[in-house]
């Protein structure tokens, strides 16, 4: 797999679990001999939902809920077969969405 690059995008609602997952990926890749660029923090998506508190009236009384999606980008340059196998077997925390592009 010479001169190849693996791009890993991580998404999660909690930044702590996202950072631990990124740390595990970087540690696994460097342990198997690949060079790593990242984790690069990408812009956080912020979704805001406004809901009326009362069931039928009192439209002036509203409540707002916010959902933030944190993202990280990791590039693994010149991965070996050992690196790919180790990444496939890696156990990441739940709640982290992983997208891998070769």
Swiss-Prot record:
The record's listing under SMART domains reads: Ribosomal_S10
Q: Which SUPFAM superfamilies match?
A: Ribosomal protein S10
One GO BP: translation
Q: Which Pfam families match?
A: Ribosomal_S10 (PF00338)
How far does the signal peptide extend, from start to end residue? none
Q: MF terms per GO, please?
A: structural constituent of ribosome; tRNA binding
Report the family membership: Belongs to the universal ribosomal protein uS10 family.
Subunit comment: Part of the 30S ribosomal subunit.
Task: Please report the name of this protein according to its UniProt entry.
Answer: Small ribosomal subunit protein uS10
Q: From the UniProt record, report the name of the gene that encodes this protein.
A: rpsJ
